Amino acid sequence: MPLHDRIVGHFQASAQSKLDAADALAPRIEQGARLLVHSLAQGGKILACGNGGSAADAQHFASEMLNRFEQERPGLAALALTTDTSTLTSIANDYAYDQVFARQVKALGQPGDVLLAISTSGNSANVLQAVAAAHARSMQVIALTGRSGGGLAEQIDDGDVCICVPAESTARIQEIHLLTIHCLCDAVDSLLLGVEE
């Protein structure tokens, strides 16, 4: 296959995956946005975590909340647990890599806060540990995952939200995760700024 056609094929597959997932994910994304707004309105904060590309997504989300998305507004309390290399490496060295997010959640999380837990497979041990720590702190969880949802989907409690991308390709799941993050940011702004309803 010519390289040009291969590239165009990726664009087409990405667009089709997004269209195929839209109706299934929209209610979950709306539910997640309302959960975020409720927490923020009560003085809560959002902690976000993930590995690799999901770590980048966690940072992207936190930056959109702290700064702004597409509307002018005050900054919103959000923190990516993926950015402090001294903290991450000290926890990994002194305890275990699967504790790098959970120990931060235990230290920073408060009842009423929300954890945005991102894992393409749903099986990242450190993300699963973070969810357990969040539940122990009476926090709610928004799980952003794919495929069958893995162990992450199994950890969801009442009041949590699982946004599980119905795709098998890691690239397609990650692309839809980014779109989902943008949808969450837009929905939060719409709810806070009175654009919604």
Curated annotation (Swiss-Prot):
UniProt: Zn(2+) binding residues: H60, E64, Q174, H182
Organism: Thiobacillus denitrificans (strain ATCC 25259 / T1)
Bound cofactor: record note: Binds 1 zinc ion per subunit.
GO biological process, one term: carbohydrate metabolic process
InterPro entries: GmhA/DiaA, Phosphoheptose_Isoase, SIS_dom, SIS_dom_sf, SIS_GmhA/DiaA_subfam
Gene Ontology MF term list: carbohydrate derivative binding; D-sedoheptulose 7-phosphate isomerase activity; zinc ion binding
Pfam families: SIS_2
Functional pathway: Carbohydrate biosynthesis; D-glycero-D-manno-heptose 7-phosphate biosynthesis; D-glycero-alpha-D-manno-heptose 7-phosphate and D-glycero-beta-D-manno-heptose 7-phosphate from sedoheptulose 7-phosphate: step 1/1
Protein name listed in UniProt: Phosphoheptose isomerase
